[in-house]
Amino acid sequence: MKDENELRQDLVDAYLTVDKRGLMNQASGNVSCRFRDGMLISPSGADAENISADRVVYVDGEGNYSGDIKPSSEWRMHLSIYKKQESANAV
């Protein structure tokens, strides 16, 4: 199993791949992956120019996060998917 830092970088790589393929409209796309009892998710206002592993936000299973960087405004939808679909490991 990958550690948190590897998952954070994988998330950034996925974000950049989705952006490069033209599947995001400016800062309107987000990616996440299941981690611990919650998820890692792209930050609010992310774009290809400012996303980095240290800006990825951990949101626990109750929707809590810490720090100055806010998770994507879509975090509730992502967390709901993980709660309802155990086989989902990334959104």
Give the residues covered by each predicted segment.
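Short glycine-aspartate micro-motif
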Residues: 90-91
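An anion-binding catalytic pocket shared by soluble metabolic enzymes
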Residues: 2-86
